[in-house]
């Protein structure tokens, strides 16, 4: 998920992460160190991007899914952006100056930037955008991104002053990098309480990004066209068609037929896809992980010993080798090996596969088969639950079936339910939390902060869908926000990872690879572990 293609938020300008390359076989596949593009960029053409998930809306203050984020990154501009090496670069911002020991930032924005309707983007738009989540009437789920923000003030037509309540590295790497600047002249009179449902977000989005919104045929596609007035130069592509496809099988079939020509191919299909005509595949480690989330609102999962037993009962190595054909790495914590904050010198609790031990742990927690029906029970209640995942993600659907089979061996009844993406997002979001357990994934942010997902304050207003609560972890995560020294920050997070791994609010399954299929004649592409369509305005189709 994202999230955000969602979802976790990040800190320092100096961030440089080691990228682990995983080259795929075949003459037409490559890794992210592929040779540089040759030839002069050429204008024209339509790139057809395949997406299993359909966007929900086009406003970064409210969206929580990767599909929406993909479109937002093309429609809007941001004060900063993160490059392919995960370093922060200026974008709309001409300069950023830290003041008062990190408690304020003076931001000067570029002049002459225009929204798609021709109106100039000024400090008024920046102040308006950042004022929305500060309002008591704001109902979005991104509030934690701006918790540190005290105020945003206009200092001049092209200058803004951000004041913080406390030092927080998240502000520089997340609040500036992930907030799409909105047009005040269009939305300024809309009550904040009504802003999320405003038709602007779905029918008439106006940004200042490289592409302009043309149309959205729900269930079919979103069409974008090049912005001739984009402040960093007109895109080479004339149009981008973002095509919504029901599932991965259909997407791979459309990729082979040429109905789409850009798609993140599932691990189960990339070896087949690399044989398709007129395509090439770039493979590299994704900045993400896949997990099973246990809803602790459900009595079944309140006891951490039960959650530990569930993880112990699952053969994650087998899942990686059989479902993914070995194309992944077993995960134990909610952090990617790409991150400088990934703990390399500590041994976190892993709860490795041991069916006998899992049964013993459940028995100690009071779960036994008292009536001989093959299903564990406690106080007259069977250990039975529904495991949900999103429709169209073939790998997750397969994982759900494997989990069902493996847990059956220890006396747990699992019913699988495949749910359309936008419906699943609504079900798991506050105030619904309508799930027992779910197979999902987080697309990590470029700064390793677990606050938004695991802090208890984020249960009712953020991304802590599983109702995880640990007072010690809460304190550590909050304290870490004010730490700017990376070594000290990592030291603090060693304790956080230990506690999360011990509590198992998630069963961390694996770290995946990305396999980006694209036209063989696509030039200008650079692999980005976070954004599939990174710098799409600089891509072109050689003729």
UniProtKB/Swiss-Prot annotation:
The keyword Aminoacyl-tRNA synthetase does not apply. It is a lipid-anchor. The keyword Protein transport applies. Its main location: membrane. GO terms for cellular component: ATP-binding cassette (ABC) transporter complex; periplasmic space. This protein is a component of an oligopeptide permease, a binding protein-dependent transport system. This APP system can completely substitute for the OPP system in both sporulation and genetic competence. AppA can bind and transport tetra- and pentapeptides but not tripeptides. This is Oligopeptide-binding protein AppA. The lineage of its organism: Bacteria, Bacillati, Bacillota, Bacilli, Bacillales. The gene is appA.
């Amino acid at each position: 998920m994202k999230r955000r293609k969602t979802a976790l938020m990040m800190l320092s300008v100096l961030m440089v992460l080691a990228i682990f390359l995983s080259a795929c076989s075949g003459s037409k596949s490559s890794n992210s160190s592929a040779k540089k593009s040759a030839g002069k960029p050429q204008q024209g053409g339509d790139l057809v991007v395949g997406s299993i998930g359909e966007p929900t809306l086009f406003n970064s203050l409210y969206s929580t899914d990767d599909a929406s984020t993909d479109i937002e990154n093309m429609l809007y501009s941001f004060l900063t952006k993160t490059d392919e090496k995960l370093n922060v670069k200026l974008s709309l911002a001409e300069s950023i100056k830290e003041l008062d020991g990190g408690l304020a930032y003076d931001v000067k924005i570029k002049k002459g930037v225009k929204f798609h309707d021709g109106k100039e983007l000024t400090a008024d738009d920046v102040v308006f955008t950042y004022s929305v989540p500060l309002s008591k009437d704001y109902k979005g789920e991104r509030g934690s991104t701006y918790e540190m923000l005290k105020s945003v003030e206009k200092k001049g037509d092209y200058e803004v002053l951000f004041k913080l309540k406390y030092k927080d590295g998240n502000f520089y790497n997340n609040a500036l990098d992930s907030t799409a600047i909105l047009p005040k002249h269009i939305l300024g009179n809309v009550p904040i309480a009504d802003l999320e449902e405003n038709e602007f977000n779905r029918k008439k989005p106006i940004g200042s990004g490289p592409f302009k919104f043309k149309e959205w045929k729900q269930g079919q596609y979103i069409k974008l066209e090049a912005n001739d007035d984009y402040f960093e130069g007109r895109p080479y592509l004339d149009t981008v068609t973002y095509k919504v496809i029901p599932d991965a099988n259909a997407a791979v079939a459309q990729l082979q037929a040429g109905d789409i020509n850009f798609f993140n191919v599932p691990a189960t299909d990339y070896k087949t896809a690399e044989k398709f005509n007129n395509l090439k595949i770039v493979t590299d480690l994704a900045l993400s992980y896949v997990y099973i989330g246990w809803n602790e609102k459900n009595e079944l999962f309140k006891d951490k010993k039960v959650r530990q037993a569930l993880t112990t009962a699952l053969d994650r190595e087998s899942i990686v080798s059989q479902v993914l054909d070995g194309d992944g790495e077993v995960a134990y914590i909610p952090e990617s090996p790409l991150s400088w904050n990934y703990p390399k010198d500590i041994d976190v609790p892993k709860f490795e596969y041991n069916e006998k031990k899992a049964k013993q742990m459940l028995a100690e927690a009071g779960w036994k088969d008292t009536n001989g029906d093959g299903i564990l029970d406690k106080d007259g209640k069977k250990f039975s639950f529904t495991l949900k995942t999103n429709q169209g993600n073939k790998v997750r659907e397969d994982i759900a079936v494997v989990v069902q089979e493996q847990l059956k061996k220890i006396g747990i009844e699992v019913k699988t339910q495949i749910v359309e993406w936008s419906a699943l997002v609504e079900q798991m979001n506050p105030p619904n939390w309508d799930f027992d357990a779910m197979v999902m994934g987080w697309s990590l942010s470029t700064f390793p902060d677990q606050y938004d997902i695991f802090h208890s304050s984020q249960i009712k207003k953020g991304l802590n869908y599983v109702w995880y609560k640990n007072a010690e972890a809460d304190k550590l995560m909050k304290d870490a926000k004010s730490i700017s020294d990376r070594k000290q920050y990592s030291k603090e997070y060693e304790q956080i990872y230990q506690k999360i791994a011990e509590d198992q609010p998630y069963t961390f399954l694996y770290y995946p690879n990305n396999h980006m299929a694209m036209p063989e004649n696509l030039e200008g592409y650079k692999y980005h572990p976070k954004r599939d369509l990174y710098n799409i305005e600089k891509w072109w189709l050689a003729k």
